[in-house]
Amino acid sequence: MALSLQPQLLLLLSLLPQEVTSAPTGPQSLDAGLSLLKSFVATLDQAPQRSLSQSRFSAFLANISSSFQLGRMGEGPVGEPPPLQPPALRLHDFLVTLRGSPDWEPMLGLLGDVLALLGQEQTPRDFLVHQAGVLGGLVEALLGALVPGGPPAPTRPPCTRDGPSDCVLAADWLPSLMLLLEGTRWQALVQLQPSVDPTNATGLDGREPAPHFLQGLLGLLTPAGELGSEEALWGGLLRTVGAPLYAAFQEGLLRVTHSLQDEVFSIMGQPEPDASGQCQGGNLQQLLLWGMRNNLSWDARALGFLSGSPPPPPALLHCLSRGVPLPRASQPAAHISPRQRRAISVEALCENHSGPEPPYSISNFSIYLLCQHIKPATPRPPPTTPRPPPTTPQPPPTTTQPIPDTTQPPPVTPRPPPTTPQPPPSTAVICQTAVWYAVSWAPGARGWLQACHDQFPDQFLDMICGNLSFSALSGPSRPLVKQLCAGLLPPPTSCPPGLIPVPLTPEIFWGCFLENETLWAERLCVEDSLQAVPPRNQAWVQHVCRGPTLDATDFPPCRVGPCGERCPDGGSFLLMVCANDTLYEALVPFWAWLAGQCRISRGGNDTCFLEGMLGPLLPSLPPLGPSPLCLAPGPFLLGMLSQLPRCQSSVPALAHPTRLHYLLRLLTFLLGPGTGGAETQGMLGQALLLSSLPDNCSFWDAFRPEGRRSVLRTVGEYLQREEPTPPGLDSSLSLGSGMSKMELLSCFSPVLWDLLQREKSVWALRTLVKAYLRMPPEDLQQLVLSAEMEAAQGFLTLMLRSWAKLKVQPSEEQAMGRLTALLLQRYPRLTSQLFIDMSPLIPFLAVPDLMRFPPSLLANDSVLAAIRDHSSGMKPEQKEALAKRLLAPELFGEVPDWPQELLWAALPLLPHLPLESFLQLSPHQIQALEDSWPVADLGPGHARHVLRSLVNQSMEDGEEQVLRLGSLACFLSPEELQSLVPLSDPMGPVEQGLLECAANGTLSPEGRVAYELLGVLRSSGGTVLSPRELRVWAPLFPQLGLRFLQELSETQLRAMLPALQGASVTPAQAVLLFGRLLPKHDLSLEELCSLHPLLPGLSPQTLQAIPKRVLVGACSCLGPELSRLSACQIAALLQTFRVKDGVKNMGAAGAGSAVCIPGQPTTWPDCLLPLLPLKLLQLDAAALLANRRLYRQLPWSEQQAQFLWKKMQVPTNLSLRNLQALGNLAGGMTCEFLQQISSMVDFLDVVHMLYQLPTGVRESLRACIWTELQRRMTMPEPELTTLGPELSELDTKLLLDLPIQLMDRLSNDSIMLVVEMVQGAPEQLLALTPLHQTALAERALKNLAPKETPISKEVLETLGPLVGFLGIESTRRIPLPILLSHLSQLQGFCLGETFATELGWLLLQEPVLGKPELWSQDEIEQAGRLVFTLSAEAISSIPREALGPETLERLLGKHQSWEQSRVGHLCGESQLAHKKAALVAGIVHPAAEGLQEPVPNCADIRGTFPAAWSATQISEMELSDFEDCLSLFAGDPGLGPEELRAAMGKAKQLWGPPRGFRPEQILQLGRLLIGLGERELQELTLVDWGVLSSLGQIDGWSSMQLRAVVSSFLRQSGRHVSHLDFIYLTALGYTVCGLRPEELQHISSWEFSQAALFLGSLHLPCSEEQLEVLAYLLVLPGGFGPVSNWGPEIFTEIGTIAAGIPDLALSALLRGQIQGLTPLAISVIPAPKFAVVFNPIQLSSLTRGQAVAVTPEQLAYLSPEQRRAVAWAQHEGKEIPEQLGRNSAWGLYDWFQASWALALPVSIFGHLL
């Protein structure tokens, strides 16, 4: 049949359970009632194209009429049990329940049409047309009653005859009908034969027997081929009945799922993280439940819950099969024969079971049937008291379920049986029924078997012992069956002593097996017997001998099934034989009983359909013979379902989910795959899965082993899912998803690890590891530490196995190291073998974690081999830590004694030995590794020591020697290169090798060797080189100057562009190249992006040539280069976008200055938003919220974040999730917002969130946080006596930022967390003030080493960067030998002034480096850049011979590299000009008095620095040498005025008078322009903002020079001061101070308020009067308004211009406004003014950064109270000057608080401005 039958099955299944539980209508029992519909449907299905024939319809009516006969049973075969009359329920009773119901009319109409159909007054087609809607509504009502949760409110019209198909029935008569059934004792008795004699009934075609009960359903499942014209009839039925049925079905499934979730959750529970973040791991079922509660869609089909296989009996049906237990005879002694035992009397057996006692069970029915033939005609009433339970204890079930209570409730008197005596049942039938109990769990089985054995031994031998398969023997009755059969079979002596005979008869089989239970192992499963088996059967026999090979861990122990063992995969003896045709045909001739066993599974037709379909579903069904299920299925099912109340009460917690699971699985089995489409199947699968979770056995019965992969796939897809942030402020969904993922990982990782161990899914492992790497460190730590040790170790092993496929990204390496370290903590002992096994993960470990391995680690050759294999991925600090372990004397002795084998094995670690140790290597040791050193990645000091032993300058073939040195040639001096192989060929092998050194950073582009290379290139000419050859010179490109570039063609320049991306092009070169390479028209986005390395060359001309539409889309490629732009270039970009609508010309003719109308809305590119001044940041709250996903990620400045926070008007009750959704915008949070957070927990969560922002926490907010925290902890201020427990939960970043006064209160563990963080990120330490750094270092030392004890080597290594901030006393506790071995580490640390001074003194002590007069080159190599810690006098004492050109260049280069590094830049060491001058004095000055000063060449300048030479020496340089070193002169900030004039004189010789300087030349001269006079400055062409900004960026002009620059620009441009716009004000830079105060007053306040962002970042050399005028511009209407109205963000925006605010306005500033001042603004306030405007309470409100910025000149003007206030702020309240006692200190604090109240009225004067 082409059309789907699934809607019909749903209809039938909805009727079946509903009728069973609600309406067995007397004579029209379930059998008869359903036979009507089933036969009718089967008739429709089998109908041919023509109309139904008269004969077929007559047969159908005969079947129907026989089904509706009241109170009559057909005569059964001779010997069958008599029919038993079920209780009657008349049709009248049913009609009574319909009175008053809205369904009265449609139900009567349905009944009438049914009668008309039966009377042939109506055709089936007409019947469907008239009653389709009523039938569909009836099905929906019955299904709604079946599914828990109640039907939804009807929204469709009521059903009527000929009405619409989409309708509903009220079904208000169902409850009344239920009550009626209960009142009429509706439980049916058992009937053992069909209502119609199958031998007399006629089929629809006149030949086949008529179906009974569900044979109509069998016809549906095996339909005829073609329907022909009746197909339309089926289609109509499907459309009318199926659609509403499926809709109701889906609604019911939804209700089931939702109601089950809470119920299953209450049963199973769910692991949740506790307060400490730890979570006790759940199991697989809890993981699946968690997923369904968190909207994960499990693939139920892949898990096995939609497999379509019949379900095994659940615990509920196991309970149904128990019934009332029977008393059993005591077991005889083992040696007594069964035939000698006393037989159990049937009369005695029936004495205790006079009638079936409800609720019924299979065993009760069987005993009842056995006793019927010996009873009198009128049986006595059954007893009214329950039978006691059996005295013999029952074997407990093997499931993990609780054992049900078998105590029966008081019985209810049933209907008496018929009074007419019936013939006794056939003994064969009765004893065939005993086969049920050979495999039954029912307690009555033992008594039944004994009785059948004693009364009918022949039938017992034939039915049980001869036909029951070996594998079916199971359960508690197995021992009794063995004993009973052993007594009936021939003596065991008939068992042959040798091999098992063929054929194997049942007698021989039972005799042999019962004689010895190990028959299979001892006789069949031996080598000789196996060889005797035919070859085609050997595999099967071997499988039987071995038994099923199941993984016990996959399926927890549950009950056994009818096959005697667990058969989840069909691997049992019986199923394997029946399913294998070859095996079946080979065994049946010898074992005849197999044919009976395999009838059902092999499709035999000698059993009823219902038994074949439902047999596996119900407990203890018989494998042979006719069963009650076939003879009378309706009463049988009613009898079982009548026991539901008792069995539900016995297991109340599992009754509902287990019952639903069974019904749902039965429904799935009957419907078949694909029912209702994918949506319905998914809902059904989820309901099935959910209902199986509480029952361990139901779950594992269905769960497939391959379902583990599906679980991993679903979890992996969920972890990879990125939840979109919903519109609006509430982003709780996406954040909730992140929290759910965290909960999943925290609570179910052990389950996932176990699944991964079994499935080996690399994709799932990679996904899981990625999720771990994204977890916060503290959450990851809690996860790993709360897992079982074995589970964590197994997961680490799994990672190691799949390491090659995990593909960790560079950004994830730190997190991977953290994860690896946590997993290592689960190992009780770290061994060398473990190190070798996990060697791929070693590069990710932090040094402390690496040092947890035993010290003897490196003594293992395999460990050294593992280090060699993975050294390329290891960090330098890791290699340094391991290299230091090589120096342990107990391992390998002293360095000069190390053998060659050790040196080769430890080669990757040798470059990381301390230099003082590496210098101990002898020339013989070095030469032994001659071929290995070039790849060893040596540092400069180590490389020079190796070169001294390897380079032989007397050899003739110097080029070969240099090539053999490889990378070591990078460290050769120019003199050595000149003696070995003079450089001459731009493309020669030596030259190319040196260029590679420059490319990887080993060779400095500013060094002397690089200068030699440049000379080769210049001498040969760049025009002769091809573009490819020219590209290799890109590392030296900045040193080529301008002239060389002008000689190159455009093709050569374009070819070099890709190579310039990693090079630092000078601004002058960028201007030149950008102008040459930028297309004059039709510029595309791709062309602009290709020029992005040249973006610092942006000029007015090039910017004008770039179309605005191209700039709009260029953020992706230009964004990373914006940080290299000057302030003026940024202003020009902003002005380009701002000028788009409403432009007005404010300038003179020909000099049109485009000025945007104030307040004009502008759309900015995303990358420019963080660069906008506040005046241009016109974003309203709606725009912010609409684009929150973008704005939350932008790196807003402090003042921008504060400004936008005010714009958003964030409510005070905003949740943490919504705050997190703001991202970097939350950095603008105000102190008032923090103070209004009531809960301490919420407060700490918000603080943690702020400290996780990449933009950091501004100083004012930080001060607010700690003040508020102390207040909340109810601690006395300013001194805390105790520390609350909340601080132990603070993040490590907060602990690092802890105020000084709280450091002493922290625990040792907290301090160590800070130390570890500082080691990993020293930049965060350098962001602290010097006082804070020293306090932290001293507190860490106090934790590591007791006071006044020497500091050990381990303590120094643990302190890391904190060593540089120790005080004098602590520094002197370092033993000098340990200090000597630690010098290489100190060279990479920032050193505080105190420590550096003390270190310089310690270096001169004898155990360290000794007196400087005795230093050699080795001592200088060891000291490195630490030589600058010496005094200038000590440096001058170093012998000139030790400071040769090569040594001096390397020493200065190392220090320059340090200064240019990120740590060096943040360190900001003091000026070292005098020390550098003392260091190079031996080269710069003549060797003896009276000798002429040397004239430097460019090589000498590169070997030292320009400022080391005097003006006379500079002026005497050769012009070519000066041109080659021009970039060095222009970039040296140490040149004095005389040296600048001398250098500028050389530049004028080179390029002519200043009036001819081109823009790129002016830019290249840089600071040298200060050497020009006022008249020469006026000759410069200063028309556009590009040239003007070149001068505006230079600091150091005199006042006359400033005036000359500004006046020249105004004159040449023809502009008036009032017409200066945003761009030109920014371009003026420092030179803005060249305008007189009266000129400054004419500047547009609107334009200046925008330029204030850039001008305020400069330390302007303006006078106090000029600063006041600039500040006045900002309070005008075009600016920011009155100072009193300014928020902290405006003070931060204007920077140093705030120093010009009048005294009265400054003195009226409030705490928040004062904290908005930048530290630079604090430092530039004139000292007298600073002392006047700020009182002590205002000074005490300074942040720590502001207080540290107070200059000594300002402190000198302060009063004692003011200085104490500054000290208070610097030390954050910890230290009060000693002359102020404790009481005075508190008095000062109280006075501070009171002074604020006095200061508030003063603020009103700010309105005067």
UniProtKB/Swiss-Prot annotation:
Segments of skewed composition (Pro residues): 378-399, 407-426
Name of the protein described by the UniProt record: Stereocilin
Annotated region described as Disordered, given as residue ranges: 376-426
Keywords noted in UniProt: Cell projection, Cilium, Glycoprotein, Hearing, Signal
Tissue: Strongly expressed in the inner ear, detected in the testis, and barely detected in the eye. Detected in the six sensory areas of the inner ear by immunofluorescence. Expressed only in the sensory hair cells and associated with the stereocilia, the stiff microvilli forming the structure for mechanoreception of sound stimulation.
Known glycosylation sites: 63, 200, 295, 352, 364, 467, 516, 580, 605, 696, 860, 952, 1000, 1213, 1308
Protein's gene: Strc
Species annotation: Mus musculus (Mouse)
Chief place where the protein resides: other
